């Protein structure tokens, strides 16, 4: 699934599954279905693409923080909706097959630095947002689990992309064990999936805001160039020519 081009739609259109907020130079994209553990239904999928585009094109926003409302960060596709809505199932299957789902910052081609602030359980498709963030911090009570295999599904993009952040064996173990094992925030930090643990958990938003403001002190052009240089190497690899490392073309 390749990186796309940012899109934006009128900010007057209300969000029903997300909260889009701004605090100084930091924009916040908050999953807002706490009663459903922030699972993604068809409406949220559509809103995510619009929200990423809106924040990326806002000149006042230098850094974007992604987090969840309530006790969960993000728990992937709303299985209940998919099970009860044949049209939603067909559409999700088609977009997955055709690689046209655009719900993370990477999918939507966001140029600005993105911080994932994992505030609770991150499960299944929620791992996409960890894999595709530039920086990941987590509350001390955050957990990570990949239940796909436990419900007869195969891990796809999220497992592959998550392996860019940490040991392949750890990703494979999580994929094979499924819902029977949860990775703690401490373990995720030890393996390199997370760069900071926040304790107490209630301090997560403040710490993410501070980190965002620190990053925002750098010129936006430099931030975008640095981000794209790093991601381009991860996507395309490097080639050694005349004793120097360059991104492959």
Please provide the spans of the model-predicted regions.
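An acidic, glycine-rich surface segment that forms the CoA-thioester-binding/catalytic face
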Residues: 45, 49, 53-57, 79-119, ...
């Amino acid at each position: 699934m390749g990186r796309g081009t940012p899109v934006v739609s009128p900010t007057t259109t209300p969000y029903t599954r997300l909260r889009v907020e701004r605090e100084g130079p930091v924009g916040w994209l908050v999953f807002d279905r706490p009663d459903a553990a922030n699972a993604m239904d068809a409406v949220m999928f559509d809103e995510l693409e619009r929200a990423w585009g809106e924040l990326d094109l806002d000149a006042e926003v230098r850094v974007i923080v992604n987090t969840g409302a309530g006790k969960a960060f993000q728990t992937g596709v709303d299985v209940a909706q998919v099970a009860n809505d044949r049209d939603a199932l067909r559409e999700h299957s088609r977009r997955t097959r055709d690689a046209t789902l655009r719900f993370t910052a990477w999918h939507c081609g966001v140029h600005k630095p993105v911080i994932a602030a994992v505030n609770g359980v991150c499960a299944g498709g929620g791992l996409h947002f960890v894999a595709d963030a530039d920086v990941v911090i987590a509350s001390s009570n955050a957990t990570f689990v990949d239940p796909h295999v436990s419900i007869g599904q195969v891990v796809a993009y999220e497992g592959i992309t998550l392996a860019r952040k940490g040991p392949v064996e750890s990703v494979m173990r999580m994929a094979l064990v499924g819902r029977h094992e949860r990775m703690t925030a401490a373990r995720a930090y030890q393996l390199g999936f997370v760069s900071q643990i926040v304790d107490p958990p209630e301090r997560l938003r403040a710490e993410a805001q501070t980190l965002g403001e620190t990053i925002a002190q750098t010129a936006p052009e430099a931030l975008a160039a640095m981000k794209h240089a790093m991601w381009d190497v991860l996507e395309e690899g490097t080639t050694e020519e005349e004793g120097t490392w360059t991104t492959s073309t």
